[in-house]
């Protein structure tokens, strides 16, 4: 016989009967006998359990048993739980092990607390519902949008927009373009100019106004009263433009936060390419200043765009890199020969510009005789590498036997450009500068003195060449939009000017 000592727990009710009771159950070869005594004031029980030699390892209390007295008692088994009392099953708390936690029953207060938690999480649970359940939410959002009467501009990449600077710092500007969010423009995207170009474009009216202010030249007037440069603004943490400034820009896209990304540099670059196409269509030479050089030629800028002059297109032949470098800072008359915006290719030529300016019929030039030929003389024109033919019939209007009788090598002469029978050849004349036939043979100095006046008379006798007006020329092919402001700028309807 083994004795098992059990401690009372809240799951085991105390019997009020003073008499002893006996519980007996037979199951196969197992016979269990439990005797217990209890009283109303007893706080501790002692159970005596008798197990047969064939008992299981863990003892199990019977499902149903009779209890003497008016109170019911309930024991827990590893299989199930049941109790008998007053002729029926009485629901009591389960018996629990010694010093082990017992799960507390759920109360009504806890149920209400959980309901409150669900109510708090309700706004967030809608994002985890299936699409069918989310249709109602989308309809609610659309209804709220319909009730809002404000219409925002929807920026798209490539749009030209007008905006107002509302805030900023040394790194970026916040620009209002009428969209649902403020646009962002980085400082480097604000100014359409490069640092190296500022020295060329900056004009000090006190010193170099006469040299700087020429027809058709773009520049920036230096204001000493302000005394603060762009770099100084950045060091002070201030935006490079004032709040309220109206800016023109191109939409590049959106940032990760959804704000429109703007660029004034890209916008003005498109305008610059458009103006370069106009210059090329006019087919007129322009003046540029050389800013850099490399082994292939010289570099300059037109309307802020980088342009290249190959050394083969220079009027004066360059033999060494030193001679090429000496051209930096000088001004050249050039003409645009090739451009490609997609490849950022802009090629210039000094030769073509020089020929257009100085090789027109009726132009007076100075030259040097470099070679004597049986039918004339080859004359080098100025400091250029170009030369023309002075035919024997154009030396003087009096008959001569040999060219060497009137001209010598390295002799300086003044010649007049005349019409050539061959388009690619340069034809020169001294006979048209004579005020009387044979004056070059008798008094060549007088011929050179009267050269300007005689050249002017020659040009007056030239037939007028009909030039097509600009309106009749074919339109310029450009990606830059043409038309009114409301057609160019996508947000023009939102942006309105009001006079005060």
Swiss-Prot record:
Domain S1 motif: residue ranges: 156-265, 283-351, 362-431
Induction entry: By light.
A Pfam family the protein falls into: S1
GO BP terms: nonphotochemical quenching; plastid organization; plastid translation; positive regulation of translation; response to light stimulus; RNA stabilization
Keywords: Chloroplast, Plastid, Repeat, Transit peptide
GO cellular component, one term: mitochondrion
Residues annotated as transit peptide in the record: 1-63
Coiled coil: none
Subunit details: Interacts with CRP1 and PRFB3.
Protein known as: Protein PIGMENT DEFECTIVE 338, chloroplastic
Species the sequence originates in: Arabidopsis thaliana
Gene: PDE338
């Amino acid at each position: 016989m083994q004795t098992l000592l059990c401690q009372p727990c809240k799951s085991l009710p105390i019997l009020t009967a003073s008499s002893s009771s006996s519980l007996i159950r037979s199951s196969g070869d197992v016979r269990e006998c439990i005797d217990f005594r209890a009283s109303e004031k007893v706080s501790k029980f002692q159970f005596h359990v008798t197990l047969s030699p064939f008992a299981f390892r863990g003892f199990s209390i019977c499902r149903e048993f009779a209890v003497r007295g008016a109170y019911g008692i309930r024991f827990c088994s590893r299989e199930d739980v049941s109790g008998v009392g007053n002729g029926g099953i009485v629901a009591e708390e389960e018996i629990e092990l010694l010093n082990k936690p017992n799960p507390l029953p759920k109360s009504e207060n806890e149920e209400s607390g959980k309901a409150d938690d669900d109510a708090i999480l309700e706004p967030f649970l809608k994002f985890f519902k299936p699409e069918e359940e989310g249709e109602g939410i989308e309809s609610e959002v659309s209804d709220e949008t319909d009730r809002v009467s404000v219409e925002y501009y929807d920026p798209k990449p490539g749009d030209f927009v007008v905006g107002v600077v509302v805030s900023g710092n040394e790194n970026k500007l916040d620009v209002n373009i009428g969209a649902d969010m403020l646009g962002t423009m980085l400082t480097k995207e604000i100014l359409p100019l490069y640092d190296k170009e500022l020295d060329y474009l900056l004009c000090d009216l006190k010193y170099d106004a006469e040299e700087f202010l020429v027809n058709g030249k773009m520049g920036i007037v230096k204001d000493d009263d302000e005394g603060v440069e762009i770099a100084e603004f950045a060091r002070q943490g201030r935006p490079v433009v004032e709040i309220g400034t109206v800016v023109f820009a191109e939409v590049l896209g959106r940032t990760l936060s959804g704000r429109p990304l703007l660029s004034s540099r890209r916008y003005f670059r498109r305008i610059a390419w458009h103006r370069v196409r106009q210059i090329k269509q006019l087919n007129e030479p322009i003046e540029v200043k050389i800013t850099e050089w490399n082994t292939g030629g010289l570099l300059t800028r037109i309307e802020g765009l980088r342009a290249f002059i190959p050394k083969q297109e220079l009027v004066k032949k360059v033999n060494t890199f030193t001679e090429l470098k000496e051209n930096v800072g000088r001004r050249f008359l050039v003409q645009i020969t090739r451009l490609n915006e997609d490849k950022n290719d802009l090629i210039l030529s000094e030769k073509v510009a020089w020929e257009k300016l100085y090789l027109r019929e009726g132009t007076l030039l100075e030259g040097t005789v470099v070679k004597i030929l049986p039918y004339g003389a080859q004359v080098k024109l100025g400091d250029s590498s170009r030369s023309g033919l002075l035919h024997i019939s154009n030396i003087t209007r009096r008959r001569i036997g040999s060219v060497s009788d009137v001209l010598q090598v390295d002799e300086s002469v003044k010649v007049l450009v005349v019409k050539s029978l061959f388009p690619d050849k340069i034809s020169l004349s001294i006979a048209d500068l004579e005020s009387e036939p044979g004056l070059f043979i008798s008094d060549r100095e007088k011929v050179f003195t009267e050269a300007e006046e005689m050249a002017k008379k020659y040009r007056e006798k030239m037939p007028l060449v009909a030039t097509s007006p600009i309106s009749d020329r074919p339109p310029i092919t450009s990606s830059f939009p043409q038309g009114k402001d409301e057609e160019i700028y996508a947000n023009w309807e939102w942006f309105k000017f009001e006079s005060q």
